[in-house]
Amino acid sequence: MRLSLHFLGILLLSLACLSAGAESQRKLTSYQKYISKYSDLAIQHQKKYRIPASITLAQGLLESGAGQSDLARRSNNHFGIKCHSDWRGGRVYHDDDLRGECFRKYKRVEDSYDDHSRFLAERSRYERLFKLNIKDYKGWAKGLQKCGYATDRKYANKLIKVIEDYELYQYDTAKKERK
């Protein structure tokens, strides 16, 4: 009896490890697909707006759950950008820091990328970030947090971890989009 309980314990522990591994593998696969799909767009925006492609990709991955979050699916909003008073486009309401907050809604994901780049480039609170070296993703991540892009106090560390885990910094030095 003791041997079968011991065996059962090992079996349950093994199943738990396999389940955690499968979840980790699903996340890895969804992140890789997202990166493959949007890296060229992030590189284009880096060239046009001088926002590191690694930062754009990491923010898109985190804010949208690799495009799979409820908000991303309902609104094509991959950056968690809220409506603000000057927003005249589509809207969707989503629980975030508060219930029923207004978020920007886009026709296409590409429109979300365009708006994200303009959002950073045209707001004075982010101005100092554009003085950083394009390869300084750590400076950008910390700067976004200091400027109040997100309310999460660990936002910069999360961006940096995603950039380093998925080697997104390689896109900051890309000469052109992949074919």
Give the positions of each predicted feature:
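Positively charged n-region of N-terminal signal peptides that target proteins for export
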Residues: 1-7
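Catalytic cores of secreted/periplasmic lytic hydrolases that degrade extracellular macromolecules
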Residues: 2, 18-179
